[in-house]
């Protein structure tokens, strides 16, 4: 009680009847870094934090998360008030639709864009259209702004560290970010009008409240009107002995604008111990008095069960404080709900009260004639205006768990399905990730190729500045590529299509001499042809001959015909060393023999926006060599596109084939590491997860990929992936025994269960599906 009274005295202000809507907003001063002065020497700052996957965790994992959340709660220390806020706010549907729909380019592909846009609109209609933000707002009494700033710097460091341990990220909000929260609440429906230049306001001496306050506020006994919208604040009056850890999720799952806040004041340990001892002494005294009265009435067996239970609870609290690192908190739980009509408001209120009592025997109540005080308590200003305290331990407070499920919705991202938990749409922008390369894994029939084709469709139709190249070992993509006007390049020993293994553009190497880098590739190619590693002499000869055959080409500014493997072999024969002639003999089959398809000038159009290399008919002898040359050809494409400021997306199907050969695996790994700085992204696809992960190189590539899509997997592969990507057993259920189009995505540090279904009555579906009878 001592701390509660002290905080009340610090926050108490003389009541003045507000004359304007600006006066009801408890902001005295705003600083650029987001610190607000909300009372006499009372400063507050808000920290946004991200969600974690509590819902899909198993019981042991939930217990671990709960204990880690204890550490977050206990980290704030004494002398502060902390407000945890869950902010549900609807995004503007019209703006949202504009942001996700593909533009039309008035070409023959618009028919597909129309189908894709209709699919997106249908998904948006079934989505919750709610964004949920979570904040901690810390309020402290300090003599001046400078002292408050130093204090909040320490708080930010401690809070970030503890939330990181829990798997969450913390970000302090600046003045504009905080003011936007209040603007969007007070002026719901006009969120797009927020355009605050904080520095300009400061220079002009304007009151920031003018830019966030509503046009009107009208208060009734148990509800209020804000800009014509009905609002009501309620508070937690009581709760039973058991609190379900999903109560916060249940209360905030309503598809409406609302905020729920939990204010808690840490009680110093010595004060808490003294208070608990005094309460225990009082209960034991009442118990002794009861027993004495019963003895006087000769009723020796009588027991006051209420006092017995109360004593037991207090003893448990005392033991928790002494032996389980539990602290005591004075707590207020309040909530503001909004509606378009009084009837809807009453219905929502009734629904919330029912949810609370049903799940956790908690009792919410309406605030009577305190709606404004309740509102200012709920909103993350950092003030408390109502006296509805409950005393909770750390464990009891942590039961009001704010975490539920991770969401991913990158601005400008492509659509990848719906969150299986929240039903919200998933948008991933590879540019937002540290490394935009991705892996798609799934057994046959799991929807792997469909999901990859949908990715290709999305990129190709929406981004005219992007080129797409596919390596197709199963002739899986021909129908889609041809329908979009792309180029299918069949590569085999008997094909009339040729790719010159010696192709090299001026941008082949961004640092240093491109011939040096090309020489390394030719060494790998020769080693693949030889079937063994080249020794030091061989490498010197290869390097020398490479420089010689490229000399004239480079001197003519890369404008003459490029050398071929035949030219390279002829250069080998000119050398005096016996080893050079041995090398020439070893590669003769691939330059002048029946497998010379890569020793001739390139005669295919590689400038098309959509290219598929069909390598189905490459025989066993040509496959490893062919894969190396195709990969090198891709590197030429990527480096050339970088000069043109075009993006390149490389889709490598059945990627496990490349890891079956040492040199293709090594070259792929080199490309995988380099493509990001060239403005390109590599996407690997495979159904043979176990085979691929036998390669340490493949394991490194998968574990380092920021974007991994796991569709239905074999049991052995589930175990392997869970170890490699640190996925818990409970999370693996989302890609075990699942229907096509369902699985788990690893997006950065987020793990998101997803469902991706596409309407069957579309031309796009027929182009993307591989089901017999449905595919074109």
Where do the model's predicted regions map?
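Extended, folded cores of ATP/NTP-driven motor/assembly subunits in large transport
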Residues: 1-403
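P-loop NTPase motor domains
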Residues: 52-53, 59-78, 85, 89, ...
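Hydrophobic anchor at the beta1->P-loop junction of P-loop NTPases
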Residues: 440
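Conserved lysine of the Walker
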Residues: 448
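Hydrophobic positions on the alpha1 helix immediately C-terminal to the Walker A/P-loop
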Residues: 451
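Post-Walker A helix-loop "phosphate-sensing" segment adjacent to the P-loop in P-loop NTPases
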Residues: 458-469
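A short helix-turn-beta junction within AAA+ P-loop NTPase domains corresponding to the substrate/partner-engaging
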Residues: 485-489, 697-710
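Conserved P-loop NTPase
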Residues: 725-776
